[in-house]
């Protein structure tokens, strides 16, 4: 399972011209579920995201988590994070889980974020073509994998 985490001032997801989710200060997560992933990977990553200290404290030092600052999370499923580009020029997505497996794990990941104390967890539309807009804060972008 792979998560690309971006600290944002705001972010939103639009599907077919309609905004389906938006957040203020917090994290935009692009989440890729692999064929071999399970609840252990999803749970570990959710706790890591909730606990990662990447927000500034009173001195400006990265010392606070999204949970500490009461930030929001916008999680977007993105199977292309599992692309294999080692051979040829067309990415292979063989390592990505099929939708029947990926969607429940994505939902489990989001539920575990809530259980870990993240005040607001919103999502895009699983499997849809989405327009994702964001205002980076920093920028701070981190890739997490388990």
From Swiss-Prot:
Q: Name one GO molecular function term.
A: Ser(Gly)-tRNA(Ala) hydrolase activity
Q: Which PANTHER family does the entry mention?
A: D-AMINOACYL-TRNA DEACYLASE 1, D-TYROSYL-TRNA TYR DEACYLASE
Task: Please tell me which top-level EC class this enzyme sits in.
Answer: hydrolase
Asked whether the UniProt record includes Magnesium among its keywords, one would answer no
Annotated catalysed reactions = glycyl-tRNA(Ala) + H2O = tRNA(Ala) + glycine + H(+); a D-aminoacyl-tRNA + H2O = a tRNA + a D-alpha-amino acid + H(+)
How is the quaternary structure described?
A: Homodimer.
Q: Which gene encodes it?
A: dtd
Could you tell me which Pfam families the record lists for this protein?
Answer: Tyr_Deacylase
The record's Gene3D superfamilies line, in alphabetical order, gives: D-tyrosyl-tRNA(Tyr) deacylase (3.50.80.10)
UniProt domain comment: A Gly-cisPro motif from one monomer fits into the active site of the other monomer to allow specific chiral rejection of L-amino acids.
What does UniProt give as GO cellular component? cytoplasm
* Main localization (coarse): cytoplasm
> Out of the domains of life, which is the source?
Bacteria
Annotated protein name in UniProt: D-aminoacyl-tRNA deacylase
Q: Describe the function of this protein.
A: An aminoacyl-tRNA editing enzyme that deacylates mischarged D-aminoacyl-tRNAs. Also deacylates mischarged glycyl-tRNA(Ala), protecting cells against glycine mischarging by AlaRS. Acts via tRNA-based rather than protein-based catalysis; rejects L-amino acids rather than detecting D-amino acids in the active site. By recycling D-aminoacyl-tRNA to D-amino acids and free tRNA molecules, this enzyme counteracts the toxicity associated with the formation of D-aminoacyl-tRNA entities in vivo and helps enforce protein L-homochirality.
Describe the family membership recorded for this protein in Swiss-Prot or TrEMBL: Belongs to the DTD family.
Organism, as annotated: Rubrobacter xylanophilus (strain DSM 9941 / JCM 11954 / NBRC 16129 / PRD-1)
Q: GO:BP terms for this protein?
A: D-amino acid catabolic process
Intervals of motif Gly-cisPro motif, important for rejection of L-amino acids: 138-139
The answer to whether keyword Lipid metabolism applies is: no
**UniProt keyword terms in alphabetical order:** Cytoplasm, Hydrolase, RNA-binding, tRNA-binding
Query: EC number(s)?
Result: 3.1.1.96
Compartments annotated for it: namely:
Cytoplasm
């Amino acid at each position: 399972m792979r998560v690309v985490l971006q600290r944002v001032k705001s972010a939103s997801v639009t599907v077919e011209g309609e905004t389906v989710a938006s957040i203020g200060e917090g994290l935009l997560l692009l989440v890729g579920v692999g064929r071999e992933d399970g609840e252990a990977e999803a749970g570990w990553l959710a706790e890591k995201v909730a606990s990662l200290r990447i927000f500034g404290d009173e001195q400006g030092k990265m010392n606070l988590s999204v949970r500490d600052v009461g930030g929001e999370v916008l999680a977007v499923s993105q199977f292309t994070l599992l692309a294999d580009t080692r051979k040829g020029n067309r990415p292979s997505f063989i390592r990505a889980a099929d939708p029947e497996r990926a969607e429940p794990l994505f939902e489990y990941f989001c539920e575990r974020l809530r259980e870990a104390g993240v005040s607001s967890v919103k999502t895009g539309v699983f499997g849809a073509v989405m327009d994702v807009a964001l205002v980076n804060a920093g920028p701070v972008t981190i890739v997490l994998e388990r």
